[in-house]
């Protein structure tokens, strides 16, 4: 479909997952820029293409924010890894092995090292956790405001809020 706002729903995450492309999901205009820059750095580190999931509610509004440093200060996890660059002469099964066993874990390691997934607020005695990304994260925060729940009252209730920036593959250590 065309890259434009639309009245009909479209979804590409399944195609991106099938192509083994890590997906970042920003919730605000500022995060589109932040995750876009982080996505470039993640791509350099992991050798993978990186996608941004963008929904109409995030794109069809204006906002003001300070631009991050385009050079960025990213942590590149240490450790030995094979050559993860795309090489057209690699046999298909080797390409798949590199993607599944090296590129995707490298993208997860980059997300972990750079705090793309984060605990928004925590509770000393956790009873319930909410995981929300992108637009759904903003909806959850608005629902909390509507219910009169601030971070202190959520902590008292044992509620933890987790916001993944990398929605696929999920970073397992969070």
Regions found by a protein language model. Name each.
Residues 26-174:
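Flexible, low-complexity linker and terminal segments
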Residues 1-44:
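Thiamine diphosphate
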């Amino acid at each position: 479909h065309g890259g434009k706002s639309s009245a009909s729903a479209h979804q590409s995450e399944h195609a991106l997952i099938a192509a083994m492309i890590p997906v970042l999901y920003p919730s605000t205009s500022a995060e589109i820029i932040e995750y876009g820059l982080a996505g470039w750095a993640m791509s350099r580190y992991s050798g993978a293409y990186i996608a941004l999931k963008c929904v109409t509610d995030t794109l069809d509004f204006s906002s003001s924010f300070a631009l991050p440093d385009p050079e960025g200060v990213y942590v590149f996890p240490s450790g030995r890894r094979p050559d993860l660059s795309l090489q057209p002469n690699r046999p298909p099964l080797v390409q798949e092995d590199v993607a599944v066993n090296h590129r995707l874990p490298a993208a997860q390691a980059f997300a972990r090292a750079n705090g793309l997934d984060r605990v928004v607020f925590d509770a000393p005695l956790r009873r319930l956790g909410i995981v929300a990304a992108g637009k759904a994260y903003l909806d959850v925060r608005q629902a909390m405001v509507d219910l009169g729940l601030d971070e202190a009252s959520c902590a008292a209730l044992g509620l933890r809020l987790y916001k993944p920036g990398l929605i696929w593959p999920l970073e397992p250590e969070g």
